């Protein structure tokens, strides 16, 4: 049976993610105490029900992270396919969302401010985030989050999933990257007026960057580094690794490098490509 555990920071979009799972055909349960998860799985097995399960777990249920990781390991030992989806957002974004909705944080009380509650929750859930596929919703609306969840569900995973993500430094760095590489020292197509309107997916930019020896040297170096270290992470039973590639605006160099790496790694690893700034190319 396939089981998806959805967790993350309050205000980051867990409910939206769970609704998308339901729309995708999953049997969904919100805020299930973890000690009840084996009983839920057994119930569906006894009914010969092949429905895929999506369960939201968070601080409201007094989640014990050590217990959560043990539950995941136990279910996997029984042959179930267990995935963890973790949604998060920047602190300032979460504060704004709580202010707009006028809802209280689950950990808020007279002795703890909203910021303190968010910090405690982030620290509490970090061990779960370490084994999860992470979606940062800071710059997403509900529709974009739903799209990101749908794209994640499309990837058939039997081993390590490598997420290749392009981004622009001027918009901030991804907070869920395992490896991050800076492309700002490479020749920039942006300064060519004819290339500026294009992205790193378009042939004119490809032809330009393909002809730059420094760019090809960078691709070779990143490929060598990544292929050296990914097997070690796989040995640690990691399910996901995010490789973030950044340039100034996230439109040309970083997109090109991600696509180039994807072509080289295809067939060796399961890949998910994300272009954070080039929205029309995202989550293919």
UniProtKB/Swiss-Prot annotation:
Q: Which InterPro entries match?
A: P-loop_NTPase (IPR027417), RapZ-like (IPR005337), RapZ-like_N (IPR053930), RapZ_C (IPR053931)
Which keywords accompany this UniProt record? ATP-binding, GTP-binding, Nucleotide-binding
Q: Where ATP is bound, by residue?
A: 8-15
- Pfam families attached here? PapZ_C, RapZ-like_N
Q: Please name the GO terms that the record assigns under molecular function.
A: ATP binding; GTP binding; molecular adaptor activity
The cross-references to Gene3D superfamilies, in alphabetical order and at most eight, read: P-loop containing nucleotide triphosphate hydrolases
Tell me which residues bind GTP: 58-61
User: Is Nuclease set as a keyword in this record?
Assistant: no
Q: What are the cysteine partners in each disulfide bond?
A: none
Under the heading SUPFAM superfamilies, the entry gives: P-loop containing nucleoside triphosphate hydrolases
Taxonomically, the superkingdom here is Bacteria
Family, similarity comment: Belongs to the RapZ-like family.
Q: Which NCBIfam families match?
A: PRK05416.1 (NF003828)
List the HAMAP family hit by this protein, alphabetically: RapZ_like
Indicate what this protein is called per its UniProt record: Nucleotide-binding protein NMB0738
Organism, scientific name: Neisseria meningitidis serogroup B (strain ATCC BAA-335 / MC58)
